[in-house]
């Protein structure tokens, strides 16, 4: 026992941790027996004192912290402001969640810190205080929940619940708080069972991988070591961790202070020596670890170090592998049981802040930072390198250095006050947290139409879906509008932009009685959902009525629905429309079938180069019968030339639909019937029939000719070829050829019947049997493709001028390939040639594609369709005239303007705002099949104005004769309507100088009203703005299909220039102030701008940051609860061991951890390549593998220690090192430069590969691999051990096939076979002696080579240490 004089006298309170340290020191000094005697006395003393001063705990002892009230109030205030910002669209949902969590976490932490001082001041002998803060029972976290606040809770998945529990358990919880609190309790109950089994399985795998590791030697003779330094280049290692790393280790090298040796090689380090080395300020200490031991199947005493049980060097025969496995696995099992007394309360961290020391002006270099958003959505600057920030005051200049990857929260030259936060240092730069990628789905709060305010790209992993990626921070807008599906009406008669009553779908009337305009004729139309008899069906359609409403009787000149194919309307696509080919006057004379120019826009609205923009199907190139198309180039064939015949044979095969242009083609008609397999056919194959012959029970032939019957898959094809049959003799060489065209005027010289053909003929050879054959001469229809049809005359000439390098050209194309059959179905006709308008632009332009879209504007029952193509300034337009009958059941009778009711008796215009009227907007659903309707009513809009404070410039007023009607109309304007303002288009029909319907209501005797000032702009529901050029007005005459431009030189004073703050189509977030003394706006989009007011459509903004995935297409209709956007963000898992254990398992199984990949495999490959290239072949593979293995080992040890240290669990590094050594000690033999010893792809030990390479004196190519603990257990030298772990049958079968031998070196094999385990007393000392002699022989043989190799290896390892010092991240250990 030590002398009393040498002992230090302590007189202070110690807690549980200090007692642990005291006990370990006692064992070091006095040994086990004496220590147990001392601890017995301490125990007796403790029980005596506890009995004398026992603590009683009552509910009154739980004292609530006085400052809790205002702390919670302050947090609620911050949360309310945050909610407002989210509502305005300034922060998105993830930023709001993060900020909310940090606000409440900080509040909870402040309360926790207040707790101890509060107890100390008010009641130092409070039983709760004494019990918890002495460490006797309970901890600060539990007391905090009793008297502070429970705070934020984790749900069973470890995710945060952002609603905090503000009450503590003393005050009692509300119902909501109680339910949230139960999540934590449930988490405890369920997770305890699950995690305990996980921890047990982890222990089993750990023991499995290292069970054979036994101390078998005193010294393996290695000269390698790992350097440990208290001062790394990046940061200081804490002294406590440094001491823990060194105690119990063995030095790998002598330590010199100056020229004096203070510690020698192979000396074990005790606490005294470590303290002396720290005092001397030793820079780096080289120690031996299990990593440096020269064998993988055992370990020596010096590389292991001291035994943790009795403080001496470990004994021979000690099963240190099993001890290591249990040391790592067991704390996990205990921690799973321990964690849940706090009930799933979230523990996290807040970022560190840099504050200004005093008032002053901020100065920094703006080139070194770039603007960004913080994780809370605040604007900030991110600095990449150390940034010097200078704060200038009146007489002091203070400099602060901001570390890299930090956020600067102030601007340059900004004035800051004392203690103001100027920078935020990221938490990740100091502590390593396991993070994970989390998806957060944002759902739409309301139904409406989606818009976004930036270009989006298509998400590459969702090629065929509607997911888009946002390239930059922008808003998504949901524009309001009530929606309803059109399932009640099979083909909705409501077109885009109709005016209608909102409750129209509740009407169950299926009939519409429609009165004609001039009451000449009353027609009754019926809806019917039964399409069995299309001839009796009539659908009321008003898509194209005659031009003058008051002249002729009610006449549907141009119908969109034909009786023959009644499902045409169902297939009508929203992205195609037809421009009628004839003028209106010609159409009145006769009912003309559907023909016109079809303008088609792709579904996505994007045209690429040489896209077909419009096409015209010429009725001259239509055929009703089936047949074969032939075309090509004239080519003389040598054989047929002798017979004086020219074959017209195509030499080019057509590849796509629109590829080849020809000037002449031939159509060979034939009658085709496709019959079911079971049909009874009444004619024979190769027989000749006449017209109207019965073919089957209900089919008769339309032409006469030769019958061909062909059986195909599950059907019979019956063809009738008309023409002449010719039986040739042997001299006719034409009989050898089949399928040729003969031009007119050519005959056969040698034949007896010499005749000339007037038209082209088609010669086809037919062979009914092998010997017999004949030739069928078939008539041919010849078509010449003339350039008479010129689409250019049908379009406005402006389109063909080269504006902005866009060109339109006309081409004729054949729709069917050469020799391809065309099949006509029943009565429909086949179009053979199509005239196309091809869109192209300048080759030098960088544009790969241009966008095109429709604009539809509805005014006074007129609908204009505009097409806009990229940069083209002129628009194509066509008109559909609507007639809404006055007494129609489903359509609003008041079709002029739903927001005005017209009294026919007085003719006075009365303004009446109707809430139940609206404008229809049509949509395709996501499956592109059925249509949805979006109804935009006045309840979705609000009016803003009048603008008393907005100045207008250069307004030229005009003298308009005072008229009461005009005054009312101009002054009132539409309130809350989404339809365009009437007074803009009201003068359009007047250009025809006809007194048509509009004039009845607005009797204007002054024609100058035509050229009135434009008081408003138009915007469509698409959000497309019809901008009017200030110097020219685009006016559409409803009776001709072209545009008029009224330039300023006609009436120089009709136009005005206004400059206002609000632009049309602009989006506003809520709370934006437009003018002084104006009310704050709600968020929305400007629909109508007048001189003194504006109408705004309500909208809800959602902020989205780059990388967010938007679900849905632009202007798609979304319903409430639809997924709008997905955010992907990183978040730290909450810090208890239940989340930590899976991370330990992931590291040990070498799986990548979600967002932070360990990247060890990649590092290994890179190192191998570089090192081999630098050092050359001889030792390249060995050294490359060594360095990567050293690097990955240290990284793994650090990551595992992080998890355990965060829980206050101390595990000695050597235990983790033994495990990590096993999973990093294998290399994979590669194919290049393969030697004859190992197979490519074989896993072998690194040292075995090294020895084999030296023995063969040639390089073996291999690379280091990381095995997980499971794979390492299945790749051992013992097949019995592998089979007892898992996959028993497979392992034993493979071992038998390979003829493997098990040397029974491990513990497990001997247990399985009932032998003596080679550890402890059963340790075989003879084995050690034999192996030592064997090693000495090898060393003598290879002394020269080995000395050379070890010198090289040492040099490279020293280089490696310096490299690692500079490259390992701050989160890693400084032990290399």
Curated annotation (Swiss-Prot):
Matching NCBIfam families: rpoC2_cyan (TIGR02388)
Binding locations of Zn(2+): 220, 293, 300, 303
Pfam families from the UniProt entry: RNA_pol_Rpb1_4 (PF05000), RNA_pol_Rpb1_5 (PF04998)
Coiled coil ranges: none
UniProt key word Signal: no
Species this chain originates from: Arabidopsis thaliana
Gene: rpoC2
Origin organism lineage: Eukaryota, Viridiplantae, Streptophyta, Embryophyta, Tracheophyta
GO biological process terms on file: DNA-templated transcription
EC number(s) per entry: 2.7.7.6
Protein name according to UniProt: DNA-directed RNA polymerase subunit beta''
GO cellular component labels: chloroplast; chloroplast nucleoid; chloroplast stroma; DNA-directed RNA polymerase complex; mitochondrion
Family, as annotated: Belongs to the RNA polymerase beta' chain family. RpoC2 subfamily.
Catalysed transformations (reactions): RNA(n) + a ribonucleoside 5'-triphosphate = RNA(n+1) + diphosphate
Keyword list, A-Z: Chloroplast, DNA-directed RNA polymerase, Metal-binding, Nucleotidyltransferase, Plastid, Transcription, Transferase, Zinc
